[in-house]
A protein has these predicted regions:
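Glycine- and acidic-residue-biased ligand/ion/polar-headgroup-sensing regions
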Residues: 55-69, 82, 175-193
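Hydrophobic alpha-helical segments and helix pairs
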Residues: 57-97, 104
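Conserved small/polar residues in nucleotide/adenosyl-binding loops
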Residues: 225-229
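Hydrophobic secondary-structure block in the mid-to-C-terminal portion of proteins
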Residues: 148-204
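Hydrophobic, well-structured mid-protein blocks that either form specific transmembrane helices
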Residues: 85-132
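Short beta-strand His + acidic residue motifs that chelate non-heme Fe in jelly-roll/DSBH
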Residues: 68-69, 86, 93-101, 171-173, ...
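A short glycine-rich, His/Asp/Glu-containing loop-to-beta-strand
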Residues: 5-51, 55-56, 105-107, 129-173
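Short acidic-glycine-tyrosine-enriched beta hairpin
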Residues: 72-85, 194-211
Length: 229
């Protein structure tokens, strides 16, 4: 199913779920997964200061450098191999700008519904540990369930990356029985639970506590698991 979004000289954005001017009643959320935006920002451009509240916001850098500034006083640059996690809670403002004047920045921004209203706002930037190929690699976990190189959110939600070799099959297991998973392919092609997915394709999977993911080519994917609402 085609994604929503917009294309211009400053920004190319693709929305998996309803966002901004894109609305599809069939694609509002998957469990607590509310937004999955795939953004490419031109050199020197970006998103000026804007507000958020009561949302867990995860940013994953794919290429280039993303400069972040917020009302809590954080000024950081996010690069590939790092993730950024914000709890908007009672309210924050922030900006996201391409830190380069010559190269575009590409990143995923993912919003997760919070487990409770009005948490204290916070910002965390994490350098990810090296990932083994053909093994799901946790990058975000619920509070207290991760580690030094894992971000955390106020929600029973998990994020993994998976670097998969061609023809390799990995059994993907839910963290908790009854959870669902959303698989989003960054590069290459996979077969997930019997369905073929190409670059930037995504699919929600429910009703199974585990399912196979096969590399149709060498591939890179990100997955999300949470109780399906």
């Amino acid at each position: 199913m085609p994604r929503g979004g917009a294309t211009g000289a400053e920004l190319q954005t693709h929305h998996t779920f309803s966002f901004a001017n894109y609305y599809d009643p069939r694609r509002v959320h998957f469990g607590a997964l509310r937004v999955l935006n795939d953004d490419t920002v031109a050199p020197g451009e970006g998103f000026g200061t804007h507000p958020h509240d009561n949302m867990e916001i995860v940013s994953i850098a794919l290429e280039g450098a993303l400069r972040h500034g917020d009302s809590m006083g954080n000024m950081k640059v996010l690069r590939p191999g790092e993730i950024q996690v914000m709890s908007a809670g009672t309210g924050i403002t922030h900006s996201e700008m391409n830190a380069s004047e010559t190269e575009p920045v590409k990143f995923l921004q993912i919003w997760v519904l919070t487990d409770a209203q009005n948490h204290t706002p916070r910002y965390n930037q994490v350098e990810l540990a090296p990932a083994k190929r053909n093994v799901p690699h946790v990058i975000v976990a619920p509070e207290g369930r991760g580690g030094e190189h894992v971000g955390w959110v106020h929600q029973d939600a998990w994020f993994y990356t998976l670097d998969l070799d061609k023809d390799r099959v990995v059994e993907y297991r839910m963290n908790t029985r009854g959870h669902g998973a959303y698989v989003f392919v960054i590069e290459g092609s996979v077969e997930a639970a019997g369905e073929e997915l190409g670059p930037r394709d995504g699919m929600g999977i429910t009703g199974a506590d585990e399912f196979p993911i096969k590399g149709e080519t060498d591939a890179k994917a990100v997955s999300y698991t949470h109780l399906t609402l």
